[in-house]
UniProtKB/Swiss-Prot annotation:
GO cellular component terms, semicolon-separated: extracellular space
Protein name: Uncharacterized protein SYNPCC7002_A0175
SUPFAM superfamilies noted in UniProt: FAS1 domain
PANTHER family recorded: FI19380P1 (PTHR10900:SF77), PERIOSTIN-RELATED (PTHR10900)
Pfam families: Fasciclin
C-alpha cells in the first residue's frame, strides 16, 4: 500500500500540498513510520488563500511546517473515530475541532473525501486550509 506522500504525489489535485510539504522539509516524516491522520487541503483549498500567501510561507519553512503539522494528528483515525472524539490534537500541539452533525467538518473545512487508506495512516481531503487560532 502506498504511503501518505505517495498518494499525494500521484494525485494531481495535491500538487500545491506536495510542494508545500517539500518546502517545509516534511516529506520524510509523512513518508515514514506512522500512523498519521492527515487533513489534506486540495489545490482548490490552497487557491482560496489570499494572493501571495503560499509564496510567503514557502520562504518561511518553520512557519509553513507549523501550519502543515496542524493538518496532521497521530494515529489512524477514521471519519467515525473523529466524529466520536469531537476534537483531536494536531502533531503541532493545537486542538482541531471536528463536527459531524450535518457535513463532516474539520475546523473551518468540509471533508470532501474521507478514509483514504495509506500504509502509514489515513487521509481526509478538505476544501480549505485550516488555520490555527
Amino acid at each position: 500500500m502506498p504511503s501518505i506522500v505517495d498518494i499525494a504525489v500521484n494525485n494531481e489535485g495535491f500538487s500545491t500540498l506536495v510542494a508545500a510539504v517539500q518546502a517545509a522539509g516534511l516529506v520524510e516524516t509523512l513518508a515514514g513510520e506512522g500512523d498519521f491522520t492527515v487533513f489534506a487541503p486540495n489545490d482548490d483549498a490552497f487557491a482560496k488563500l489570499p494572493p501571495g500567501t503560499i509564496q510567503t510561507l514557502v520562504q518561511n519553512p518553520p512557519q509553513l511546517a507549523r501550519i502543515l503539522t496542524y493538518h496532521v494528528a497521530a494515529g489512524r483515525l477514521t471519519k467515525d473515530d473523529l466524529i466520536k472524539l469531537g476534537e483531536v490534537t494536531s502533531i503541532e500541539g493545537s486542538p482541531i475541532p471536528i463536527n459531524g452533525e450535518d457535513d463532516f467538518e474539520v475546523k473551518n473545512a468540509t471533508v470532501l473525501a474521507a478514509d483514504i487508506e495509506a500504509d502509514n495512516g489515513i487521509i481526509h481531503v478538505i476544501d480549505n486550509v485550516i488555520l490555527m487560532g
